[in-house]
Amino acid sequence: MCIRDRFCNVDDKAVVQSIDAETIYEVPILMQAQGLDSTILEKMGLPVGETPGLGPWRKFLERRHAAETKEPINIALVGKYDLQDAYKSIREALSQAGTYNDRKVEVHFVNSEKLTDENVGEALKGMAGVMIGPGFGQRGIDGKFVAIKYTRTHDIPTFGICLGMQCIAIEFARNVLGFADANSREMDEKTPHNLSLIH
């Protein structure tokens, strides 16, 4: 009798170790090595065939490790939320995009509430691209517009997600198309030049 059998009412083969991994992307390989995939299929009454090949996953990991040794590409993430978990999915998406392009991506958070015309150049210095993050409401909006205008006038690639993309469209309408009062009804219900993006 295995020692694990004495302490819980779980089959020995259904108890797996939570092994430390260098990256979360190694966890599926570590779990498969302990037979967790087959055990789950058995418990669910599903046929257990051949162990699924994780070849593509392993190749991704190899690329990820190789990319980590390359010179990083710096991307600024402009947003208002101090809690970095608010942008976790964006950071991971940028990191994975870097892996598939054989580059390490370093994401630098830039607080949009503290961004001004006077400090934007220093805040975005050395950035290969800028991501304007999502959010709601007025807080931090002015700083996003400052960042967008700076990146547009300095030819820095800029991406926007949700409100970030709306801000890019509004800044363009205001400063390129000449609609100084362009806005979104989300922020100004009475704007005469409403920009609504379908996304």
Which residues does each predicted region cover?
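N-terminal beta1-alpha1 cap of cysteine-dependent amidohydrolase-like domains
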Residues: 4-198
